[in-house]
Amino acid sequence: MTRQGMRDDLRGEADSVVHDGTDDIDNENDIDNGIDNENGNGIDVVLVTGLSGAGRGTAAKVLEDLGWYVADNLPPELIAQMVDLGLAAGSRITQLAAVMDVRSRGFTGDLDWVRSELATRNIVPRVVFLEASDDILVRRYEQNRRSHPLQGNQTLAEGIAAERAMLAPVRASADLVIDTSALSVHGLRDSIERAFAAETVAHTNVTVESFGYKYGLPMDADTVMDVRFLPNPHWIDRLRPHTGQNADVRDYVLGQPGADEFLDSYHQLLNVVIDGYRREGKRYMTVAIGCTGGKHRSVAMAEALAARLAGSDALTVRVLHRDLGRE
């Protein structure tokens, strides 16, 4: 079952809740906490909660980037059903995260109920609690021009105070508390990645795309490299009909002076760039390699580069040959 299909099944008759944007932080203290998976049944469950505006939405996005199935603002009564679907799906879905907030009535009781329900399934959910100082929360709400969910006819500061008091018991029992007052989005991402580092590898998705310059540059490329410095197999009669995926063409291209040196140097350069992208929270990268027609040299070099990149456990690599078949 796809994530979207699972989400649709779970929502059923529940009303949709639109995320208001105030939980995406935009503002670094150092947090070095880790939380261990206590479940022995292969399903790991995390409940993300905390003060409105403290960064729950950002935390949810980080977990999703790390490969978790994330349900944002799922009604509490459906969280146990979400876990049941995860259990039924076997090992394909092993990490589930649910975002809970005070917009659900009787929030503290709801959280206790969810914990109790999951306990009957031999699952001990971990609770991540996000908070921030009052002045930071006020600033974030004012910047987003949103009202606090508990504000009502009160002032913004009073709404924040009411929520902080309501959630005090939840904070006290949380497995991990993150204060986002001085954290940027990247800082929060780093904190969550460190907390879950023992069980999750932060993969970067790299697409290596070959193309022909005569058809234009790929618009989605993050970096472009030109391999027209290599001799063109087009001018060799026995190679012309074939593509860079053909063994003879590949051996010809990779056997040229400078081909291996290029691949070694470019591979090292990309490792530096990818590490920088990862620190900045960028999880997707397109590397374009071009030749004249996108049939021989760029195809062979793209395949060879992708094979080198695929040796890293932190990368998910795919190859795309944009212009094959256009001639």
Swiss-Prot record:
Gene3D superfamilies: P-loop containing nucleotide triphosphate hydrolases (3.40.50.300). Transmembrane segments: none annotated. It comes from the Bacteria. Residues 1-29 are annotated as: Disordered. GO terms for molecular function: ATP binding; GTP binding. Residues 1-22 have a biased composition (Basic and acidic residues). Keywords: ATP-binding, GTP-binding, Nucleotide-binding. InterPro entries: P-loop_NTPase, RapZ-like, RapZ-like_N, RapZ_C. ATP binds at residues 50-57. NCBIfam families: PRK05416.1 (NF003828). Belongs to the RapZ-like family. Displays ATPase and GTPase activities. This is Nucleotide-binding protein Mflv_3714. It comes from Mycolicibacterium gilvum (strain PYR-GCK).
